[in-house]
Amino acid sequence: MLAVLSNHVYRHLFLAQLIALVGTGLATVALGLLAYDLAGGNAGAVLGTALAIKMAAYIGVAPIVGAFADRLPRRALLVTTDLVRAAVALCLPFVDQVWQIYILIFVLQSASAAFTPTFQATIPEVLPDERDYTRALSLSRLAYDMESLTSPMLAAVLLTVINFHWLFAGTAVGFVCSALLVVSVALPVVRRASDARTGIYEKTTRGIRIYLKTPRLRGLLALTFASAAASSMVIVNTVVIVRDQLERSQSDVAIALAAFGGGSMLAALLLPRLLDQLSDRRVMIFAAAVLAVGLSAMTIVTLTFADAPGYWLALLAGWAVLGIAYSMSVTPTGRLLKRSARSDDRPTLFAAQFALSHACWLVTYPLAGWLGAQSGQAAAFGAMAAIAAAGAIGAAIIWPSADIDALAQPTNAAF
């Protein structure tokens, strides 16, 4: 897998992604502490609002930026958004009002909504070979999982010697380093198929129209709901299950999340070889089915053995299985997007996936949390299992088994 790093351009881009991820992880910890510093017991409401603003920025900004990304130099766009994020990070330590957090978070996440899909659409241009690109996707998944495990630990170590405000400085350094790595390489020039002028509506909706006209991508949307259901259950309710239901320590929350992350990392390591042998469709639909079965099993276990001594081990095993299946269901996404559009359409298509996937999370995050709080964790598990099962079945129906690599070309009346 690491052989793909021999590509000079990709190596720099991967390091830029990795450093920016660590910086983002530090900012996540610091933002929670800043919210508590300003709002005290209402910090949860502040963070919840910040999360909603983040999702709104991702869903609203990504398609707009994606529509114009092919008309802008990609390197300049990536560097500019990195520098904007660095500037916002440097402003956050000076915040003394909650509303200021909301404004800065919107600017920060809008820049991320511009950076991430453009970055993702650039990788297949740098690595046109399918096998190399698959390995790059697995490395990217590993980077995300490693960040989720290491950034909180790094923040904990730093907080023993510095004030949390300095974590924002670390975030800014990460974004600046990312910008320097991007500017140090020449990115492929993507030529537009046509210079014909089109309206704003046509440009901003093109990615979603291509997405919805492509059967494999409609199937991908169903799979995205399945993966969002599983990840929402883990992200939202792990702390409640471990701390409230099991009455275990804060470190056990980290252990449970590490079980999910470890499973995801294991799958990312194995996926390149697996995808050499099996189709994306078979792997991803099977993974979604495993998510549904795993969540269903946890529903039964929670209903019958929630108070048993072995529930903790069952939770760890369940989270590991969900982590494996989650990684298998989301990692090949880039391969589907790559083969579903021309080079000049890829930024807008990646932006469409970015927005639609976060729209799925915008549904499943609050649903998992509300059901867990109001009806109990078994109800939350059951609802997420139903969503995952519907996603797996829907994908199997919508995504043709004889998948043809044809590019969908939407008309103005198609959407």
Predicted regions and their residues:
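Alpha-helical transmembrane-bundle signature of multi-pass membrane transport and export proteins
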Residues: 1-415
